Amino acid sequence: TARYTALVAKDAKRAAADMGKVLHVEIDPEDAKVERMAKDESNQFGLFSWEFVRRHGLHLFGTCSTWFLLDIAFYSQNLFQKDVFTAIGWIPPAKTMNAVQEVYKIARAQTLIALCSTVPGYWFTVAFIDIIGRFAIQLMGFFFMTVFMFAIAIPYHHWTLQENRIGFVIMYSLTFFFANFGPNATTFV
């Protein structure tokens, strides 16, 4: 990023040129300001120092804890999709199929979820990231993932009924959509 190029690599000219390309305007590099910041002793501290913890500890803890919670929810959904699809009756139990049929039906269900939710979530992020902004997209994604996960989890028995399968799949897909049109925005941008 331009911020890294200017503040860490100490190359204000390159940072200004990079941002000029992105914003389609000419930006004057502030070499003097970058040099002044580089010489400032208050900006010189180690990664494992109390100054680092004082300046960045709360943000780092907040970021790590939310990503940890997201990863538990997101990767659990991916790992246990087969069990979820079987529980709601979207695919038959494993004992009723041979191994090839089971793999085919699980792969088909996972592909449908990916094509109808995860991939569109990515493209929505690409389309709207410069309009809405990363931060707003991430907040919205975290919020709606939480809403849809609670909407699935709290009345779980409701979703296991035959007549509610389509609704479950839609809600389940929306959690994956908002994973990519949300927290994962910084992963692939």
UniProtKB/Swiss-Prot annotation:
SUPFAM superfamilies documented for this protein: MFS general substrate transporter (SSF103473)
Compartments in which it is found: Cell membrane
GO cellular component terms attached to this protein's record: plasma membrane
GO MF annotations, alphabetized: symporter activity
Positions in the Cytoplasmic compartment: 1-55, 133-134, 187-189
Inducing factors: Slightly repressed during arbuscular mycorrhiza (AM) formation after inoculation with AM fungi (e.g. Glomus intraradices).
Membrane topology designation: Multi-pass membrane protein
Example GO biological process: phosphate ion transport
Catalytic activity line of the entry: phosphate(in) + H(+)(in) = phosphate(out) + H(+)(out)
Gene3D superfamilies recorded: MFS general substrate transporter like domains (1.20.1250.20)
Transmembrane regions listed in the UniProt entry: 56-76, 112-132, 135-155, 166-186
Keywords: Cell membrane, Membrane, Phosphate transport, Symport, Transmembrane, Transmembrane helix, Transport
Role of this protein: Low-affinity transporter for external inorganic phosphate (Pi).
Other notes: Although related to the sugar transporter family, it does not transport sugars.
Protein family membership: Belongs to the major facilitator superfamily. Phosphate:H(+) symporter (TC 2.A.1.9) family.
Name the record gives this protein: Low affinity inorganic phosphate transporter 2
Organism annotation: Petunia hybrida (Petunia)
Source taxonomy: Eukaryota, Viridiplantae, Streptophyta, Embryophyta, Tracheophyta
